[in-house]
Amino acid sequence: FSCAIFDGAGRLVANAPHMPVHLGSMGESVRTILRQRARDGRGIKRGDAYALNAPYDGGTHLPDITVIMPVFVEDDTPSFFVAARGHHADLGGIAPGSMPPYSRNIEEEGILFDNMLIVDDGNFLDAAVNAHLTAGDWPARNPALNIADLKAQVAACQRGASALADLSAAHGVRTVAAYMAHGQRQAETAVRQLIARLDNGKFRYAMDNGAEVAVAVAIDRTARHVTIDFTGSSATLPDNFNAPLPVVRAAVLYVLRTMLDDPIPMNEG
C-alpha cells in the first residue's frame, strides 16, 4: 500500500516513497476526482471518500484501488486531499488474483472502480460497495475481504485528514499550503538543475514477447527542460501487458528522481 498527501489541485506533496509506480500516478487519480466531480451535479462534499482503480484515470492494474478523501478546512472547497492506494488480493476477473495474462478487455481483468463514492457523510456505503464488487460476469471472489481492506484505507485517509486539519489549525491553512508549494518548487529546481547536466540519447529495448520500447531523450539546457519521446515503440498489445499514460509518467519521473543526489521529497515538482 501507499499513502500520500496532495494540495487542493491534486498535486503530490508528500508520501512514503516505497512504491514508485503508485506515487507517480496517484496524482492523476485525485485530479480525475476533481475533474469529474466538478461537473456531476453533486460535487465534492465533507465526509466523502471515493474509490478509483481505472487505468486511464490514474490507476495501475485493477487490484490497486485508490481511496481518495478531500480535506476541508475553512470553506466548502477542499484545501487538500489525502489518498491511500492498496493492492487487493483479488478483484474478480477470469483468474484469481485479477492479473490474467490473457485478458482481452477490462471486464476480464476484474471489477472497475472509476470515481465511485464509497463514503457519504462519514458513513461507509457497505451495500453499494458490495453490490459493485459482486456485479458482472466475473465478480470479486471475496468481497468481504475487499470491503475490510477498503475500510482500512478509509481509516488511513481519516488519520491523514485529521493531522492536516490539526496542522492547519495550528499554523493557518494558507501557511501550510505555502510550505507545500515551496517543497514542490524545491523539487522542481533540483530536477531542472539535473536536466541541465544530461545529454540527448536514443535507446531501444526488446521485450521477450517480441515487442520493442523506443525512447528518445531530448534535452534543452537553456530552458532546463527534457522531452521523453516513445515514438517508434510497438503498438498496444492485445492483452493486459500495456502501460497507460499515468504509469509511463510515473516511471519517467522515478528515473529522474533516482539520478538526484539531493535528499528532496518525491512530489509533483
Regions found by a protein language model. Name each.
Residues Q158-T236:
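Accessory "access/gating" subregions that flank catalytic or transport cores
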Residues R11-V13, G27-P70, R204-A206:
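Conserved mixed alpha/beta core segments that line enzyme active sites in large multi-domain catalysts
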Residues L112-A190:
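N-terminal leader/propeptide and maturation segments of large enzyme subunits in energy/redox metabolism
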Residues T77-P139, T236-D239, A250:
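Gly/Pro-rich active-site capping loops and adjacent beta-alpha segments
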Residues F1-S2, V67:
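Short loop/turn microsegments at loop-to-beta-strand junctions
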Residues P20-I33, A89-S98:
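A short, polar/charged loop-to-alpha-helix boundary motif
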Residues I65-E74, A83, A218-I219:
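A short, hydrophobic, proline-anchored segment that marks a local hinge/packing element in signaling
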